[in-house]
């Protein structure tokens, strides 16, 4: 994968429910990223890439992903970017890109799911300075 593994907000682990990362330690495939080493984001922002490798398992289920930031690792997160809310049969599999700026230290992807018997596989959420080629 052409992305930096240290900038991986979710690593492809199957999602079976809402995931709210609050730690630098990976749990359920998700993690909080410490942006201090990056000295915040560049002037033109940073890209967040959502890759959904397969469709949702059940009709009526949804997945919504937001990018949040905070000055504190475990709490105080505020939404700074979002991806479209996806449902079975709409836009999956697919790749979505959004951009954001932050001067705060911590960034996470909040994954909110609704429905019953929820399962989403091959989901990656990645950060990148330039997630696409500029010609």
Regions flagged by a language model, labelled:
Residues 53-62, 115-119:
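Extended, low-complexity, turn-rich repeat/linker tracts enriched in Gly/Pro/Ser/Thr and Asp/Glu
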Residues 79-89:
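Solvent-exposed serine/threonine-rich low-complexity stretches and specific carbohydrate-binding patches
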Residues 59-74:
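Short, surface-exposed beta-strand/strand-loop-strand elements in extracellular ectodomains
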Residues 37-38, 48-57:
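Short amphipathic, basic-aromatic surface patches that mediate peripheral association
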Residues 46-50, 100-120:
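Noncatalytic modules at the cell exterior or secretory-pathway interfaces
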Residues 1-41:
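Solvent-exposed, flexible loop/coil segments flanking beta-strands in beta-rich domains
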Residues 33-35, 92-101:
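Exposed aromatic-hydrophobic patches
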Residues 1-17, 114-135:
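C-terminal interaction-tip segments
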């Amino acid at each position: 994968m052409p992305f930096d593994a240290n900038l991986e907000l979710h690593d492809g682990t199957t999602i079976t429910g809402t995931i709210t990362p609050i730690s630098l330690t990976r749990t359920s495939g998700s993690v909080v990223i410490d942006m201090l080493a990056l000295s915040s984001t560049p002037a033109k922002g940073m890209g967040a890439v959502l890759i959904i490798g397969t469709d949702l398992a059940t009709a009526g289920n949804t997945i919504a992903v937001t990018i949040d930031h905070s000055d504190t690792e475990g709490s105080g997160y505020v939404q700074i970017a979002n991806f479209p809310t996806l449902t079975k049969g709409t836009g999956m599999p697919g790749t979505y890109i959004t951009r954001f700026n932050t001067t705060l230290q911590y960034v996470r992807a909040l994954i909110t799911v609704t429905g019953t018997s929820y399962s989403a596989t091959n989901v990656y959420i990645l950060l990148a300075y330039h997630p696409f080629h500029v010609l």
